[in-house]
Amino acid sequence: MPEFGIVMEPSAGYTARLAAEIEAMGFDALLCPDTQCLAGDPYGQLNLAAAATRRIGLSTGVTNPVTRDSSVTASALATLQLESGGRARFTIGRGDSSAAHIGKRNAKTAELRLYVEQVRDYLAGREVDRDGTASRLRWLVPGALPHVPIDIACTGPATIRLAVDLADRVSFAVGAAPERIRWALGVARERLAETGRDRASLRIGAFVNLVCDASEQR
């Protein structure tokens, strides 16, 4: 079945109430951007939203490999997963506004891959080699945390291929034009054919900007 979610900036005092409203409207997910100079902290607001809801998925929309260490992200996600009763999702991209507003560049594809692999291993309770230091979430019992789905937001072909390799979910960020969606789907399908991964094991979606107005031109 298709799912529909809303991307909403985390806003202290409002996120939990609005999360309850969109759940009552029938939406399936709430995603809060992790962009520290433009909005509040997403994880605190998502945990408050978890307490105010019962069904919807809760996710960053998106986080990035630049502004938080992978262990910090994993710890925040594990906490949200426990607080929400298993409704957390790990949605990540290369980093745009979050990096630009502190004078840093987006993560390269290889950096994104390493970061996602580290977060995945932390969440599974495994040790992660951090430049010779054996690191893990010592407060988390290995295997005790329900799986947190990995969702990679993709714009270019390299990131789409990476997402097909690593993620549970792929979210295209290529606009709403049908020809752009068809192109992105083509790249994903080619990678699935190359690796032999079962298409049924991967959920595919898209970020779409939606503006309601009586005038199409405006």
Predicted regions and their residues:
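A cross-family glycoside hydrolase active-site/sugar-binding cleft signature
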Residues: 5-9, 33, 59-61, 91-93, ...
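Internal, glycine-rich beta/alpha segment that forms the wall or movable "lid"
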Residues: 2, 74-169, 174-202
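Short, acidic/turn-prone active-site loops that include or flank metal/cofactor-
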Residues: 34-37, 63-64, 175-179
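Glycine-rich beta-alpha junction loops
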Residues: 96, 176, 207-214
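Catalytic cores of alpha/beta
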Residues: 70-81, 212-217
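N-terminal beta1-alpha1-beta2 module of alpha/beta enzyme domains
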Residues: 1-61, 148
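Active-site mouth loops of central-metabolism enzymes
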Residues: 2-13, 63-70, 144-155, 210-213
